[in-house]
Amino acid sequence: MDKIPAVKVYQPSYFSDHRGDLWTIWKEGDHDLKFNHDKVSTSKKNVLRGIHGDNKSWKLVTCLYGKIYLVVLNTVSKKWGSIVLSDDNKKMVLIPPTYGNGHCVLSDHAVFMYKWSYEGEYPDVEDQFSISWNDPTFNIGWPVKNPILSQRDEKKH
């Protein structure tokens, strides 16, 4: 995410043993944000969600299970960055308002989590912007050529 320094990548501390893993996604005081909405998305391999964003919400995102290729883009500078998030690396990305994000599932199955922080009402679909996953303005190097898309994301194609 070097090309877009407003986007922050975090590596939480975690504990692993023969039973599995334990890690903290967020605790009060970690960020100067009040998170007020959580969402979880499950998808299969080659599903591409996004690119979506809005003008008022911060998003802390992570992959709880599986592996995804996350893309975050700055709609003003037209720069983008990418990172692989997985249950192995446990990395998290904090995305500021006005930035778009999308992800493609690399594993057979993935569970993706968003923590949202915003003032007022939730910025639902009508308050969000969408950018086509293959918009030539950004020339994003997605790791999949024929992604599985929602109707909403196909319309931006």
Q: Positions of the model-derived regions?
A:
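Non-catalytic, conserved peripheral segments adjacent to functional cores
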Residues: 1-91, 109, 116-157
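Short HxH-centered metal-ligating active-site micro-motif
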Residues: 94
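Ligand-binding loop in jelly-roll beta-barrel domains
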Residues: 97-119
